[in-house]
């Protein structure tokens, strides 16, 4: 599974518009890799089967988006650990992988290159090969101070004295 995290300036756009831009870029990346992908609402599909799911929201003027692209996986293991959906109004989608659709799993490098090539122009941004040391340090501080705390992850009130 290739995970994608995007943080971008909102620029006045609504969430559905931003999600559609991201889904379209991911679908183009998947087509670069050799599969006939289509951007759907909050997903990318191939022949009606979901290969990528997206979710996101705004934090003030900033879009925070996450996506998971199924490159290759052990479907039997996935089926064994997931709880089946029993809601007839919202049946679980059929899923597929890039390996199944193009005959082999593309390398991580190929997937990242395709995603970067399609996402960068949409967001008018460069996509570096790695985070700068100061970005890594900031991410580690934020993880330790807030995002990685159990209370944040579990949606519980912060401990006394923690903001």
Model-derived segments and spans:
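A glycine-rich, hydrophobic loop/mini-helix early in the fold
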Residues: 1-11
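Long, positively charged amphipathic alpha-helical accessory segments at protein N-termini or as interdomain linkers
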Residues: 9-38, 50, 57-163
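Structural motif
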Residues: 46-47
């Amino acid at each position: 599974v290739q995970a994608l995290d995007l943080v971008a300036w909102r620029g006045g756009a609504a969430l559905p518009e931003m999600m559609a831009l991201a889904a379209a870029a991911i679908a183009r990346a998947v087509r670069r890799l050799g599969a006939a992908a289509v951007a759907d609402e909050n997903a990318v599909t191939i022949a009606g089967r979901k290969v990528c799911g997206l979710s996101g929201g705004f934090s003030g003027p900033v879009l925070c988006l996450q996506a998971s692209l199924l490159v290759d996986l052990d479907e039997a293991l996935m089926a064994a650990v997931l709880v089946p959906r029993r809601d007839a109004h919202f049946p679980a989608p059929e899923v597929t992988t890039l390996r199944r659709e193009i005959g082999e799993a593309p390398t991580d490098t190929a997937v990242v290159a395709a995603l970067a090539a399609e996402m960068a122009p949409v967001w008018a941004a460069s996509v570096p090969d790695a985070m700068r040391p100061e970005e890594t340090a900031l991410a580690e501080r934020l993880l330790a101070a807030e995002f990685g705390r159990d209370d944040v992850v579990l949606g519980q009130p912060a401990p006394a004295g923690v903001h």
